[in-house]
Amino acid sequence: MISLEQVTVQRQGVIALDQVTHTIYPGQSVAVIGPTGSGKTTLLETIAGLLPVQSGNVSFADSSSTTDSPLNQQLIGFVPDGNRTWPMIRADECLELFAMNSGLRGKQIDDAVNRALEEVSLGNLRGHRIDTLSSGQSKRLLIARALLCEPHILLLDNPYAGLDPVGFQIIDQLTTNAQLTGRIILAVFNDANVPDNFTDLLVLNDGQKVTAGHFQPKQFTNVDKWGVRLKCPSSAAQAAKIIRHLTLSSTVVDDDFLTCYLPTNRGPIEEAVAALIKAGCPLESCTYDPPWPAQVLYSLIRD
């Protein structure tokens, strides 16, 4: 468990986190969103023990970050944003150095390096020099480094940036498996385009926690309307008429696509979908446009 109690953190004399209180439980995968400068990366670095806490407390079960370094306890794996400049050594040699620095010895190092490389599908490149890896492979090596000690907590800063398709699948699998293994995943997203396999959403603004809840649109009551895009092949105009009584406004984009705003106080999006199906109107897809976490964020900033 991660517990933050009235945590305040400064960066270069400016408050970056302002009395943030939040608890994250084993098995939760939490997506953190917010505008640029809202404190998202600062939150991760504070939990990782990389930034000092001015006031308040960060604790992990019975261990407080003010007295112990969670990274040294092999508790946390941290994947920073972007790629890093690596030494000109082999991939496996690089991980061996990090494993030793984490306190592993002898066979523990070999086992950890082999497992981490396989987990990110780099086992066949273990003997390659790091400077020969592609940017996507290099980002996967960062993930492997974070997984060396099988951490209970995995912190991901903008995890999909710079990843190749294999890396996308790895992050998705880690997130899905967290609920089964009890691992905590805390991931920062700069664009609020969050995959739906996360369990929770945390919104920051100006260094403060604005709202949080389970990863379901209905949990966020600050939104008064949802933007939706429907694909009704050759029937967009017909669809607009069918759900007119449920919408605040609608726009027929072309013969196939319709965008509309649905008020949250008239029922969920499923009601509009049900109305179209009942009327026999062809419906191929119905999606939030933009993604609903982004709409939650925009609504909070607007207010």
Role assignments for model-derived ranges:
Residues 179-184, 189-259:
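ABC transporter nucleotide-binding domain
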Residues 96, 100, 108-125:
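Conserved ABC ATPase "signature" region
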